[in-house]
């Protein structure tokens, strides 16, 4: 293959081909004749060489292109390319799906013979041969030189950025051309010099490789190229890419591939320079096997490289890592499992062997190789043996397979010491330690540990990873499919690869293995995992995933994806330090969605660490999946055991055990059940209360433990356990609560935890409640765990959970509110205070909200309460408080309220509350007591059944039954009312607790009580079930209660984990500094203009005139001027004035009232100026004066902006003209002529418009939309999407409590038939049932005749079923 450098640039293409023919010729000459090219090559080579020779390699020294060269460049660089060539290029691009460089190169190579080029591309040119790996960085020097080189205008970029190259690639500079084009020559020479410098620099060490030939010498020699060509591969002649441009040809340097092949950065890396010299033109060498192997492994390379070069690894090179990456190899597992490592390796090995000198010669594991590395370690060994140094280190690796792999990698990477020391050792060490900790990981770790020194290089690490991954894979395959790994995205996998290369992976591997260890040493495993995780798990996980990816199916996917990447990774690997190992790889979207996944550490807690946090590994998925899943699984096993034990315990005390379960689920299980139980039972209430309030994070005590454990293990186990434990409620509550907890745990835990937990907790709580005792109490603990164990019940949650968060802060307030609420009871006040109560619940409010939401429905009975519940704040707190009223629950009025409270409570308390309510005082007391748990617990406080019932929630321990009991009690006490409320509650909250308890309560009563803990737990199960069901069932705890308003109207879906008011209070606090506080609803958020008010002025002033239409480019800004001051706008850009959302926008009850809109934060303060806000942009007076006002003149005059041009005159003049519309009048005749508006017109004179802002066609802006053309922007303030105001869901608040004959009835539908006699109320307590009475009068005609008869009005009498709701005085027809 001719090694010619493919350069014939564009037009020169043909020549280039010729050049190709002559190695010596410098293709650079481009078509002009390779002779020139040669001479150029020689000259350039010499120049470059000389420069290169100069070790100092002063760029300055680099010769500028000679006039001759420039001329040649000009000649060869035909900017206008033969259209046919473009067509051909496009055609080839389409046919071969190769990169433009490759296609252009091929065409050039093939003298623009389309068919030949296609064959060349497909048959000969390896995939990615031309992938541009280049350090953009080099361009700096290149640019400098380029700048120096006049002829290179195009190439001024020096490297001719790939982009540039591509652009200039016009055929003239088709990539090949660029390379070849003499023009490129100039730049190339520069670049070459630069590269040489870089290479020489890095390469200085390599100079020996240069074969003693100084690059400069080589360059100097025309032969240089020739050598490069001939020697090219071996010959340092390859000499830098510069030489490379020619020499690249060495590898077929013509094959741009070589040049491109090596990432330019590679070239730049100089190390590659050595590579050049040493092998295959090092660059290419480095970059691809292809150079080295290109001839014998082209097919393989093509496969490998197809994607390998697709990524712009060049970006890595952008890092200005100086130094040779040559040695660092990252072997990423690739899909080519099919290729036997041996084959690839052997091929590679052969090449390597052929060029043993370049131990560093990149031999990357072929894509398939990684998998097979272990298996075919022997081959690897062989190949690695060819690689001199590396072999030994691998030897240290414990596994023979590993050894080969490692050796292979080591040999390949033969990592430069720095890399070795940097990434691998630490990584490996970590891995080793981790592995050691991992236990299972130990195997990998042992080999890792053995290897850390050995693998110093990233490559080693990668190899290690691979090996580990394989082992891991086996382990995982045995232990668990690594779903998460499957989820890794290519990016992630690559990321992992890089991590692996950087040594992160080794640590991670152990982590993976840890799961096995985990099972063995659950605690250790967790800690290890946690620790490791904290340290490396997360990335490790990725790394694992990456590594295991190989092992795991995910790995496979990765591999397939990565397969191509192998080279890239290898070449690209930036020095570990360059790019943060943990760079910015974000977890997959799933992860992003889960705050919990962020490895944010609040306090000492690592949320992110516990994958477990999310029982759903899927979400954790890529990042955590391995750990998460394994943990989960183990936790499951673990849990199973624990659970089993606990279950045994359960028998003893369901609640405790449940709690334990919940805890177990939490993953506490590992902790002694007894602890958990203890903590749960004894500690739960107090602890939870305490925890929620005082020790949210520490959450010491059994609960605390549960909390943490749950947090830690909960993800997996919790979910598993808690989930199952609480199943119904448990799921959402546990899961969420736990998860939430874990997510929220520390974080949300409070803020949201309470909230969420509240709501979820309620649910969880419900679950917990459901889990009730266990969950609620214990589970609750678990759940509460986060929010507040207690919170398990919403109540507690509210009280506690909320408390937990807010409660801590707000609890008191909550209490206060609650008290108020209690006082108010159901009162909306409570509610609103509920809000505050919520506040107390803070989240609670959300929780309440959730609960409330649920509650609302449920709470139909007590509107206020319901509402309150909605606010829930009262709900929880209130609830308790309400509950107090609730005491009334008995069915007294209080009952309603209580019910409401329940609703609120429902969330946690609610049932308790209800129950508590049952015992009004008890309830309140309960609340106190409940407080511990939560208000719910308060319920506990409630003596007797109430207490029990409440107790259940609260105590859980006391008796699960309690909670249910409570509900039951409530029902019992209240009887129907309670039941109804409970039902409602259930319905609403689904509060699961409360409803569960409530609903269940009725049911549960016996159950809850009867079951006592069991029931609760289970019962909570039942109530939970009910409640849980309620939670599930009611609103579906997760769901927003039907009636409840969203906290944010936006949030229609499952309640968010945390309430999402438009602004959280914190945000508001932050916002307010910038945001003027409440303003008139529609007031602009920013000061209008000095003009102030005029609506026209308003927007317009602020904006420059409605330039928006033409996005006034102000000067530098293309975006429409915003409501930013002109100066600002120019810089800041502008946006339409933010108008508040129209009132129709519905803010949920919790949401800020619309009046409290946050204007767009005045980030850019509008500059109120004496002149218009626009300041210089717009003459201040102009608007006020009139669009045309003279003031404009002045202003514009003053304002340099306007002064610019016709505009200035037109604008200025406009003012003179004073008729804005015809600004042009004064402006210039031209203005008029140009447009009726005059140039000023936006549309008419875009140019001017852009230059200056003038009124939009001088017409006053419409309305106060600042930008005439742009409708008033919606305010930047994030207000939810505009939601037409939905009718508020039925809210208890809205209706006075429905007076129901039977409290059981959720609703009474009165069906009127004929006369009152027909009214039927369906008394079935179990469910809302409406009995419709057929209304057809027996004598419809008669009825018609009897127009007077009320029941016989023409309308109803003839309807089959007319249902008349007396309460609402509504009639409706039912089928």
Curated annotation (Swiss-Prot):
GO terms for cellular component: cytoplasm; nucleus; P-body. The modification Phosphothreonine is found at residue 673. The keyword Kinase does not apply. Residues 228-282, 426-441, 768-781, 1009-1036 have a biased composition (Gly residues). Residues 374-387, 395-412, 1265-1277 have a biased composition (Polar residues). The modification Phosphotyrosine is found at residue 321. InterPro entries: TC-DDR_regulator, UBA-like_sf, UBAP2/Lig. Residues 84-124 form the UBA domain. Keywords: Behavior, Cytoplasm, Phosphoprotein. At stage 11, expression is restricted to the neuroblasts, predominant in the central nervous system (CNS), including the brain and ventral nerve cord, and in the PNS. Later embryonic expression is seen in the gonads. Late third instar larvae show expression in the CNS, imaginal disks (including genital, eye-antennal, leg, wing and haltere disks), and gonads. In the larval brain, it is expressed in all of the glial cells and in clusters of neurons that projected contralaterally. It comes from the Eukaryota. Residues 53-62, 185-204 have a biased composition (Basic and acidic residues). It is found in: Cytoplasm. Pfam families: UBAP2-Lig (PF12478). Residues 142-161, 173-184, 442-453, 629-646, 750-767, 789-801, 869-882, 987-1008 have a biased composition (Low complexity). GO terms for biological process: copulation; dorsal/ventral axis specification, ovarian follicular epithelium; male mating behavior; negative regulation of imaginal disc growth; negative regulation of receptor signaling pathway via JAK-STAT; positive regulation of hippo signaling; regulation of gene expression. Disruption phenotype: Male flies exhibit abnormal copulation. They fail to successfully withdraw their genitalia upon termination of copulation so end up 'stuck' to the female, tugging to separate. There is also a 'non-copulating' behavioral phenotype. There are no morphological defects in the male genitalia. Females can mate successfully but have reduced fertility. Complete loss of lig function results in lethality during early pupal stages. Gene3D superfamilies: DNA helicase RuvA subunit, C-terminal domain. Residues 1-69, 142-286, 374-453, 613-646, 750-801, 869-894, 987-1036, 1203-1234, 1251-1277 are annotated as: Disordered. Acts in the nervous system to mediate the control of copulatory organs during courtship. This is Protein lingerer. It comes from Drosophila melanogaster (Fruit fly).
């Amino acid at each position: 293959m001719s090694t010619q450098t493919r350069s014939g640039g564009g037009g020169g293409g043909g020549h280039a081909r010729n050049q190709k023919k002559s190695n010596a010729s410098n293709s650079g000459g481009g078509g002009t004749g390779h002779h020139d090219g040669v001479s150029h090559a020689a000259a350039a080579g010499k120049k470059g060489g000389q420069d290169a020779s100069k070790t100092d390699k002063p760029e300055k020294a680099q010769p500028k292109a000679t006039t001759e060269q420039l001329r040649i460049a000009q000649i060869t660089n035909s900017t206008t390319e033969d259209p046919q060539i473009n067509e051909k290029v496009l055609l080839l691009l389409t046919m071969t799906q190769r990169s433009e460089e490759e296609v252009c190169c091929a065409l050039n190579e093939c003298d623009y013979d389309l068919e030949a080029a296609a064959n060349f591309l497909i048959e000969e040119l390896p995939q990615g041969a031309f992938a541009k790996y280049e350090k953009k960085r080099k361009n700096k020097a290149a640019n400098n030189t380029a700048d120096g080189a006049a002829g290179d205008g195009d190439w001024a970029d020096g490297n001719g950025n790939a982009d540039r190259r591509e652009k200039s690639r016009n055929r003239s500079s088709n990539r090949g051309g660029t390379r070849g084009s003499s023009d490129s020559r100039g730049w190339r020479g520069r670049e070459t010099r630069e590269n040489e410098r870089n290479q020489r620099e890095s390469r200085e060490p390599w100079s020996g490789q240069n074969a003693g030939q100084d690059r400069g010498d080589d360059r100097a020699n025309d032969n240089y190229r020739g050598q490069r060509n001939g020697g090219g591969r071996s010959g340092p002649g390859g000499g830098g890419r510069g030489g490379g441009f020619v020499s690249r040809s060495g590898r077929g340097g013509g094959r741009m591939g070589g040049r491109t092949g090596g990432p330019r950065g590679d070239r730049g890396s100089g190390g590659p320079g050595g590579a050049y010299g040493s092998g295959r033109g090092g660059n290419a060498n480095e970059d691809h096997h292809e150079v080295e192997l290109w001839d014998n492994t082209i097919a393989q390379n093509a496969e490998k490289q197809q994607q390998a070069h697709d990524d712009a690894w060049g970006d890595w090179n952008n890092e200005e890592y100086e130094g040779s990456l040559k040695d660092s190899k990252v072997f990423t597992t690739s899909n080519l499992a099919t290729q036997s490592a041996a084959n690839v390796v052997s091929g590679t090995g052969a090449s390597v062997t052929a060029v043993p000198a370049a131990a560093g010669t990149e031999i990357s594991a072929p894509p398939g190789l990684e998998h097979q590395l272990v298996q075919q370690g022997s081959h690897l060994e062989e190949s690695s043996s060819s690689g001199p140094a590396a072999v030994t280190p691998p030897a240290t690796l414990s596994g023979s397979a590993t050894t080969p792999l490692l050796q292979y990698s080591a040999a390949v990477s033969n990592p430069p010491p720095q890399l070795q020391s940097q990434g691998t050792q630490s990584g490996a060490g970590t891995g080793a330690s981790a592995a050691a900790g991992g236990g299972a990981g130990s195997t990998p770790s042992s080999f890792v540990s053995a290897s850390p020194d050995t693998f110093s290089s990233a490559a080693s690490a990668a190899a290690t990873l691979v090996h580990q991954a394989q082992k891991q894979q086996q382990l995982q395959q045995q232990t668990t499919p690594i779903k998460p790994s499957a989820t890794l995205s290519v990016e992630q996998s690559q990321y992992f690869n890089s991590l692996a290369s950087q040594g992160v992976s080794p640590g991670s591997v152990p982590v993976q293995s840890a799961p096995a260890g985990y099972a063995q040493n659950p605690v250790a495993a967790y800690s290890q995992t946690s620790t490791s995780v904290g340290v490396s798990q997360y990335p490790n996980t990725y790394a694992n995933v990456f590594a295991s990816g190989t092992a795991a199916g995910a790995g496979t996917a990765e591999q397939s994806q990565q397969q191509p990447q192998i080279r890239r990774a290898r070449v690209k690997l930036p020095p570990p330090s360059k790019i943060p190992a943990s760079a910015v790889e974000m977890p997959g979207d799933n992860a992003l969605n889960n705050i919990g996944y962020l490895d944010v550490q609040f306090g000492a807690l690592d949320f992110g660490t516990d994958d477990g946090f999310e029982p759903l590994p899927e979400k954790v998925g890529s990042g955590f999946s391995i750990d998460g899943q394994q943990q989960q699984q183990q936790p499951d096993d673990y849990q199973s055991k624990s659970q089993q034990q606990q279950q045994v315990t359960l028998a003893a005390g369901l609640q405790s055990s449940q709690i334990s379960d919940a805890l177990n689920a939490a993953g506490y299980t590992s902790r002694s059940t007894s602890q958990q139980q203890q903590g749960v039972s004894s500690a739960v209430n107090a602890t939870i209360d305490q925890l929620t309030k005082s020790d949210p994070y520490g959450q010491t005590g059994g609960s605390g433990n549960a909390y943490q454990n749950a947090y830690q293990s909960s993800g997996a186990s919790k979910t598993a356990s808690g989930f199952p434990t609480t199943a119904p409620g448990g799921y959402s509550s546990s899961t969420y609560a736990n998860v939430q907890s874990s997510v929220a745990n520390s974080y949300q835990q409070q803020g949201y935890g309470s909230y969420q937990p509240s709501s979820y907790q309620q649910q969880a709580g419900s679950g917990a409640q459901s889990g009730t005792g266990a969950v609620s109490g214990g589970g609750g603990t678990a759940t509460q765990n986060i929010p507040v164990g207690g919170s398990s019940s919403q109540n507690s949650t509210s009280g506690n959970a909320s408390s937990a968060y807010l409660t801590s802060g707000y609890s008191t307030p909550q209490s206060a509110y609650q008290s108020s609420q209690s006082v108010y009871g159901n009162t909306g006040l409570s509610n609103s205070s509920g809000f505050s109560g919520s506040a107390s619940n803070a989240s609670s409010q959300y929780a309440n909200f959730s609960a409330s939401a649920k509650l609302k429905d449920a709470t139909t009975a007590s509107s206020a309460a319901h509402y309150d519940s909605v606010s829930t704040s009262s709900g929880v707190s209130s609830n308790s408080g309400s509950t107090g009223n609730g005491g009334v629950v008995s069915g007294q009025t209080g009952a309603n309220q209580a019910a409401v409270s329940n609703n609120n409570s429902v969330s946690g308390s609610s049932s308790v509350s209800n129950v508590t309510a049952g015992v009004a005082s008890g309830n309140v007391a309960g609340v106190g007591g409940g407080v511990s748990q939560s208000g719910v617990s308060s319920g506990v406080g409630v003596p007797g059944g109430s207490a029990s019932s409440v107790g259940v929630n609260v105590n859980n321990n006391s008796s699960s039954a309690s909670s249910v009991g409570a509900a039951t009690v409530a029902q019992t006490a209240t009887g129907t009312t309670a039941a109804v409320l409970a039902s409602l509650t259930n319905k609403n909250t689904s509060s699961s607790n409360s409803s569960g308890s409530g609903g269940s309560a009725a049911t549960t009563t016996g159950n809850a009580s009867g079951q006592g803990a069991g029931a609760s737990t289970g019962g909570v199960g039942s109530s939970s079930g009910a409640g849980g069901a309620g939670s599930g069932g009611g609103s579906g705890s997760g769901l927003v209660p039907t009636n409840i308003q969203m906290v944010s109207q936006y949030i229609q879906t499952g309640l968010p984990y945390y309430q999402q008011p438009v602004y959280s209070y914190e945000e508001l606090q932050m916002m307010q500094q910038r945001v003027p506080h409440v303003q008139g609803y529609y007031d602009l958020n920013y000061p209008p203009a000095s003009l102030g008010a005029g609506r026209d002025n308003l927007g317009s002033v602020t904006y420059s005139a409605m330039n928006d239409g033409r996005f006034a480019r102000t000067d530098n800004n293309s975006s429409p001027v915003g409501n930013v001051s002109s100066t600002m706008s120019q810089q800041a850009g502008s946006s339409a004035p933010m108008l508040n959302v129209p009132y129709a926008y519905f803010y949920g009850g919790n949401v800020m009232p619309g009046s409290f809109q946050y204007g767009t934060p005045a980030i850019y303060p509008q500059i109120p100026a004496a002149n218009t806000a626009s300041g210089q942009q717009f003459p201040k007076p102009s608007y006020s004066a009139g669009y045309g006002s003279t003031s404009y003149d002045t202003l514009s005059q003053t304002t340099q902006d306007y002064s610019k041009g016709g505009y200035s005159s037109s604008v200025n003049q406009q003012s003179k003209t004073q008729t804005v519309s015809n600004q042009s009048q004064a402006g210039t005749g031209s203005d008029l002529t140009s447009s009726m508006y005059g140039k000023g017109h936006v549309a008419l004179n875009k140019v001017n418009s852009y230059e200056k802002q003038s009124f939009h066609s001088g017409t006053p802006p419409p309305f106060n939309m600042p930008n005439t053309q742009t409708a008033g922007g919606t305010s930047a303030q994030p207000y939810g999407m505009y939601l037409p105001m939905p009718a508020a869901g039925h809210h208890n608040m809205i209706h006075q409590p429905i007076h129901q004959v039977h409290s059981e009835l959720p609703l009474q539908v009165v069906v009127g038939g004929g006369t009152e006699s027909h009214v039927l109320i369906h008394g079935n307590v179990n469910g809302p049932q409406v009995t419709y009475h057929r209304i057809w009068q027996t004598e419809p005609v008669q009825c018609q005749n009897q127009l007077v008869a009320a029941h016989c009005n023409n309308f109803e009498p003839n309807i089959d079923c007319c249902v008349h709701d007396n309460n609402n005085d509504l009639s409706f027809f039912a089928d």
